[in-house]
């Protein structure tokens, strides 16, 4: 989800 896109590390 876009809201969790920052978690894609």
Curated annotation (Swiss-Prot):
It is found in: Secreted. The keyword Cell division does not apply. It comes from the Eukaryota. GO terms for biological process: neuropeptide signaling pathway. The modification Phenylalanine amide is found at residue 9. Its main location: secreted. Keywords: Amidation, Neuropeptide, Secreted. Able to induce fluid secretion from the isolated salivary gland of Calliphora. This is CalliFMRFamide-3.
């Amino acid at each position: 989800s876009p809201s969790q896109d920052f978690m894609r590390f």
